[in-house]
């Protein structure tokens, strides 16, 4: 990247992306986010849903929550069928205490795929935060029924 001058052009774009990923691996999320921004500008905004997911990961680690929410919303807009984006959007909403919004996102995911086990687990977490323990345990049970491997500890802790 040092060989290129700013403003960066498409020629520098792959190197910016590589540096952003290296910075994420080195726990330099804020700098990675800046590289993702530089990449976005270098390619004149011609990016796909995966770009928004990767930049959201950097924003989340950098505690730039609104940025993370915006990037996940854009990823969903570009690829509404990828339910992992909806789960990620729900996770960010949970992080910032927007439990009702997280539930709405997860319900939309379940409309697309009623057997999406992770959505039920995340719904249960949101419901716990909202003091809806009975609903949370029902959501955890559904996640377990659908094969979510990460729900057992939650059931053990909150539903016994």
Regions found by a protein language model. Give the residues of each.
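Canonical tetratricopeptide repeat
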Residues: 18, 54, 88, 122, ...
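Register position in tetratricopeptide repeats
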Residues: 25, 61, 95-96, 129-130
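TPR alpha-solenoid repeat register
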Residues: 15, 51, 85, 119, ...
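Hydrophobic/aromatic packing residues within the alpha-helices of TPR/SEL1-like helical repeat arrays
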Residues: 1-4, 36, 72, 106, ...
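Structural marker of alpha-solenoid helical repeat scaffolds
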Residues: 4-8, 42-44, 78, 112, ...
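Residue-level recognition of tetratricopeptide repeat
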Residues: 11-12, 46-48, 82, 116, ...
């Amino acid at each position: 990247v040092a060989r290129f001058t700013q403003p960066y052009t498409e020629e520098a774009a792959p190197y910016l992306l590589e540096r952003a990923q290296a910075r994420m691996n080195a726990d330099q999320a804020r700098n990675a986010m800046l590289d993702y921004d530089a990449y976005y500008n270098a390619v004149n905004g011609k990016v796909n849903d995966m770009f928004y997911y990767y930049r959201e990961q950097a924003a989340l680690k950098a505690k730039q929550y609104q940025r993370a929410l915006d990037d996940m919303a854009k990823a969903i807009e570009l690829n509404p069928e990828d339910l992992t984006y909806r789960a990620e959007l729900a996770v960010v909403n949970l992080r910032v205490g927007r439990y009702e919004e997280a539930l709405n996102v997860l319900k939309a995911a379940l409309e697309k795929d009623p057997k999406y086990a992770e959505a039920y687990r995340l719904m249960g977490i949101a419901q716990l935060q909202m003091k809806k323990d009975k609903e949370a345990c029902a959501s955890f049970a559904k996640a377990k029924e659908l094969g979510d491997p990460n729900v057992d500890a939650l059931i053990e802790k909150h539903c016994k």
